[in-house]
Regions:
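A structural signal for multi-pass alpha-helical bundles of membrane permease subunits
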Residues: 1-267
Length: 267
């Protein structure tokens, strides 16, 4: 058995990158992931703090709905969600305009990353309910004395959140950010539904086996050669897909480990 190859080559890596349109798909992925993660972080940080510290009417009901979003799979409501973004009426404004003009003002957001931005900002991004729950658990374990001292010094709720809570939640913010990046990066279902021409890297990786059927016309390799290289190409496709995530994790590992320990999640 030969453990190390005698002749090293990057052909499989090049074929995987070509078949996946790596440059275009990685740009599309970044355009989707970065703004979505930032918007989602803003929403879940505020919502988690609100559920942990403020008592208001309907709080229990809203938290129950939050848990409901964690349990219910997106496949159960994808049809109305797709229909909403196909004929987006700007949260009812387009329908209101239609009462006076006779024609509803709608726009299709399909094949645009703004679909993910809106969901992230409105608290319905990928796994937003889980992140709110995690942050709620963290904030509930935070000493009340610091917030009380800030209020005595004249800080309102928002200033207390910005000056006291956020600086002490760095590890949890990084943890939630990592979770969010990974889930958006690896998402196939929503990406394949809302994108129709240019796809992110998760869709390209899933379709790599099919794309390899056409690689012989692109790269000049014979179909028989590609058959023998298939497993190596698929492995290289997985490698170049997860490589950016691995690099990110290397730099954020310390915060991630600390955040998991302080999140209040056990089991």
């Amino acid at each position: 058995m030969v453990w190390l190859p005698k002749h090293w080559t990057l052909d499989s890596l090049k074929l995987a990158a070509t078949a996946m349109d790596y440059g275009e798909s990685i740009v599309m992925t970044l355009v989707t992931v970065i703004p979505s993660v930032l918007l989602q972080l803003i929403t879940v940080l505020l919502a988690g703090y609100g559920f942990a510290r403020f008592h208001f009417r309907g709080r229990g009901l809203l938290f129950g709905l939050l848990i409901f979003t964690i349990i219910v799979p997106v496949q159960s409501y994808i049809i109305p969600l797709f229909s909403t973004f196909t004929n987006f009426d700007f949260f009812g404004i387009g329908s209101l305009v239609g009462l006076f003009t006779g024609e509803k003002l709608t726009i299709s957001l399909i094949n645009k990353p703004v679909v993910f931005y809106l969901q992230a900002f409105l608290g319905m991004g990928i796994r937003s309910g889980l992140y709110i729950f995690i942050l709620r658990q963290f904030y509930r374990g935070f000493p009340m004395e610091l917030e009380e001292a800030a209020m005595i010094d004249g800080c309102g709720p928002m200033r207390t959140f910005l000056k006291i809570m956020l600086p002490n939640a760095t590890s949890m913010i990084v943890t939630v950010m990592l979770f969010s990046v990974v889930w958006y990066w690896n998402d196939y279902y929503l990406s394949s539904m809302f994108y129709q021409t240019t796809f992110p890297i998760s869709v390209k990786l899933t379709d790599l086996g099919t794309l390899l059927q056409w690689s012989d016309t692109i790269t000049g390799y014979a179909a028989q050669e590609l058959t023998f290289m298939r497993e190596a190409i698929l492995a290289c496709g997985c490698l170049i897909t997860v490589l950016p995530l691995l690099v990110l994790y290397v730099f954020a590992q310390r915060f991630f480990t600390e955040g998991i320990e302080r999140s209040g999640i056990v089991g």
